[in-house]
Every structure is written in structure tokens, then in C-alpha cells.
Amino acid sequence: MVTLNTKKDFDSVYKSQKKWHNSYFILFFKENQQRAEKRIGFSVSKKIGNAVCRNLVKRRLRNIYRDSMSSLKNGDMILLAKVGLEKVEYKNLQDSYKYALIRLNLVA
């Protein structure tokens, strides 16, 4: 799994046209024809619990992304967690993520 690292990478994805939001997270996506890889970035605010809670949220998001990574289009993606995500059951989060991928037509 390749991650977005620099502020420049994050800013270019934030300015992209494709995004989907629900009550759990905001998904940003930018197609990247030049790269033959998929890159992901996770953003979890300090408004979401303590460090243990934020790491739990990141682990869940990372696992959901890893499960669907093989079927995604090449590009850069950011998952921005919203307040309250730490209280959501894993299955509901997974279903919301899959629905967002379908709505944005990101499944190859």
C-alpha cells in the first residue's frame, strides 16, 4: 500500500473534482494516468477522541481500503474521518465505503 506523504500531494487531491461525503467520512479521489499505482491518505482530526481512538479509526479505514484495493482504479485517494466515526460499527463503515466507491464510479 503506497501512501500520500507530502502536503502538495494532499492539496492536489483535495482540489480534485471527485468527492463523496456521508455522515462517517469524506472520500476524495483524483485519477492519475501517469502512475500505475494507487495511493491513499488518511486524515483523522484531533477532534476524534484520544490517540488510541484515532489510531483505531485509521486501522479500520486502512483495512477497508486494503480489502478493496485490487478492484480500484489507479489514482490518489484521501479518506477524511468525521467526528463520530469511532462509534460506528465496522460493517456499517464498510458498507458506506463500498457505496461511495460505486457512486464515484471508482471500481474498475
What are these regions (language model features)?
Residues 1-108:
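Positively charged, solvent-exposed patches that mediate nucleic-acid binding
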